[in-house]
């Protein structure tokens, strides 16, 4: 059963940088420029990420002079919640308004092991996957690091009401994370830091459609973050049909980058494989996929796709999903079927935002 809470849009105007975009060392540098001791950075982070205050006046252990400097330099407002949809399984989807009127989606998913959040990195997407609602309308702009951080802060504030916490996160919302690489990395470091929300690196997952140069760069980062590839096809011809990015970053080159990442980090990689009825879900596709992944330290996550009205793809029948899984397992592939959540709300990535855009143009 769906429960929806809808609020009015606000006139938001952010002329100053978001304070949520600053890493701890950047806050320390700013304080030094202001003639303030750098230990104040830890106090400020405590107010932002532990107490989660909404204004500078509540930072009672800071001098009024420092609070004024912060107010004059950084915006502390986060996001305006436009829509909050709650599913019968506890999944909550948020539609947040940004300062310039654009909207983004964030999803809270409840598991036996804790609460997971799926965050967005861009307003729209330029990748053009033919099955995805996120790319409808194209890319509007990148999110700043602080706008990605603010999604987690806002969801955590909602969980504070029931004394729960965000225990893990996936960067699989609207947009291509590696298309906004610097802001992505700033976000991850803020969220991971012990003075931030302190979500462990191994409890975070970043997914990419396959921007190869950034895969090599990501392999050199010092964060032990889980890594996933949106694959969705076992060969170049089919992948190019489903994901036009494959024409720029071809599958053989992508597999080489993935092998480099696995060898460089020693970490297992996850391949996301959405199943589209009659397109990529036959036994021969599973056999071809097993051959493609042979020798790669990996896990395959099979995704029964959500129906998107603007797209032509249909869901693979349940029996066919199990057959596809069995075919992979019989060939030694580590595979699971992703548990569906939020099926009774607009839980497919980009659906709620697309619906909101339609209502605005009526």
Curated annotation (Swiss-Prot):
The protein depicted here goes by the name Probable dual-specificity RNA methyltransferase RlmN
Question: What taxonomic ancestry is recorded?
Answer: Bacteria, Bacillati, Bacillota, Bacilli, Bacillales
Essential cofactor(s) = [4Fe-4S] cluster
| Keyword flag Calcium | no
> From its record, what is one biological process in GO terms?
rRNA base methylation
GO molecular function list:
4 iron, 4 sulfur cluster binding; metal ion binding; rRNA (adenine(2503)-C2-)-methyltransferase activity; rRNA binding; tRNA (adenine(37)-C2)-methyltransferase activity; tRNA binding
Active site residues according to the UniProt entry: 105, 349
Q: Which cysteines are joined by disulfide bonds?
A: 118-349
For S-adenosyl-L-methionine, which residues are the binding ones?
Answer: 175-176, 207, 230-232, 306
Instruction: Give the source species.
Output: Bacillus cereus (strain B4264)
As a miscellaneous remark, the entry gives:
Reaction proceeds by a ping-pong mechanism involving intermediate methylation of a conserved cysteine residue.
Pfam families reported for this sequence:
Radical_SAM (PF04055), RlmN_N (PF21016)
What does the UniProt entry say about where the protein is found?
Cytoplasm
């Amino acid at each position: 059963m769906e429960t929806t809470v809808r609020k009015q849009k606000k006139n938001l105007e952010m002329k100053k940088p978001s304070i949520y975009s600053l890493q701890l060392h950047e806050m320390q540098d700013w304080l030094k420029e202001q003639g303030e001791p750098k230990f104040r950075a830890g106090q400020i982070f405590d107010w932002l990420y532990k107490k989660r205050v909404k204004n500078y006046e509540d930072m009672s252990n800071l001098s009024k002079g420092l609070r004024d400097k912060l107010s004059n330099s950084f915006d502390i407002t986060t996001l305006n919640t436009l829509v909050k949809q709650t599913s019968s399984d506890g999944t909550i989807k948020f539609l947040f308004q940004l300062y310039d009127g654009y909207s983004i989606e964030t999803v809270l998913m409840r598991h036996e092991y804790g609460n997971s959040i799926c965050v967005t990195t861009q307003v729209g997407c330029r990748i053009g996957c033919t099955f995805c609602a996120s790319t409808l309308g194209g890319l509007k702009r990148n999110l700043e690091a602080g706008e990605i951080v603010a999604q987690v802060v806002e969801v955590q504030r909602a969980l504070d009401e029931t004394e729960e916490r965000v225990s893990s996160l996936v960067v699989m919302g609207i947009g291509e994370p590696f298309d906004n690489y610097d802001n992505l990395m700033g976000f991850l470091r803020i969220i991971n830091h012990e003075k931030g929300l302190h979500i462990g690196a191994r409890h975070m997952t970043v997914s990419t459609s396959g921007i190869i140069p950034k895969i090599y760069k990501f392999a050199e980062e010092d964060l032990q973050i889980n890594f996933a590839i949106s694959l969705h096809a076992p060969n170049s011809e089919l992948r190019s049909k489903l994901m036009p990015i494959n024409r720029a970053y071809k599958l053989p080159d992508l597999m080489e980058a993935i092998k480099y990442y696995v060898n460089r980090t020693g970490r297992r990689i996850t391949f996301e494989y959405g199943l589209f009825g009659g397109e990529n879900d036959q036994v021969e596709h599973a056999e071809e996929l097993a051959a493609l992944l042979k020798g790669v330290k990996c896990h395959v996550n099979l995704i029964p796709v959500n129906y998107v009205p603007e797209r032509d793809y249909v869901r693979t029948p349940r029996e066919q999903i199990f057959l596809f899984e069995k075919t992979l397992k019989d060939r030694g592939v580590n595979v699971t079927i992703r548990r569906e959540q939020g099926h009774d709300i607009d839980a497919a990535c980009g659906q709620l935002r697309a619906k909101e855009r339609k209502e605005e143009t009526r």
